[in-house]
């Protein structure tokens, strides 16, 4: 009985780093964070659209199943990151020590710092026009839709008339 308990504890401790960091390891997070320190910070405000934005992913309208409505940051369409990522089947992890979100989707590994105009995509820094922001009332992180969608292999089209963003997968995830 005592051996089983000790074995369980040892296995849990061995697996902790794997489950906590998945395919994005601490070294990669620290490396990205060091590079993000050189990136310009931004102060943009989240604002609601005057009308509801429709979001269609691979021909499926997900507008009504989103927990948080898309919003605008400095005029750029932004989505709640976890909400969007979960709709496409991506894994999301918050790295509080670095104020950074990690996303794993197929072969894509993305790290997104809050309030920085850049993201880390498969080991490369990609500049963004707008930084990811945390909505004060809901503690939800918003990121420009086009940036995250393209980083995860989606083509983005916007239809002004119907106020619809259409995302089409351009890669196989498995």
Which residues does each predicted region cover?
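Primary recognition of N-terminal secretory signal peptides and signal-anchoring hydrophobic helices
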Residues: 5, 21-174
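Sec-dependent N-terminal signal peptides of Gram-positive bacterial secreted proteins and lipoproteins
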Residues: 2-23
């Amino acid at each position: 009985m005592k051996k089983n308990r000790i074995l369980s504890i040892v296995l849990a401790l061995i697996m902790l780093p794997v489950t906590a960091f998945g395919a994005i390891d601490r070294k990669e997070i620290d490396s990205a964070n060091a590079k993000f320190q050189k990136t310009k910070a931004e102060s943009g405000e989240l604002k609601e659209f005057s009308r509801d934005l429709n979001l269609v992913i691979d021909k499926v309208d997900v507008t009504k199943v989103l927990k948080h409505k898309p919003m605008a940051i400095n005029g750029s369409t932004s989505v709640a990151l976890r909400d969007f990522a979960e709709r496409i089947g991506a894994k999301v992890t918050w790295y509080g020590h670095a104020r950074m979100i990690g996303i794993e989707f197929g072969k894509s590994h993305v790290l997104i710092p809050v309030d920085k105009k850049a993201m880390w995509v498969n080991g490369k820094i990609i500049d963004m026009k707008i930084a990811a922001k945390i909505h004060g009332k809901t503690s939800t992180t918003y990121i420009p839709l086009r940036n995250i969608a393209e980083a995860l292999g989606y083509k983005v089209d916007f239809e002004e008339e119907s106020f619809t963003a259409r995302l089409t997968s351009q890669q196989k995830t498995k």
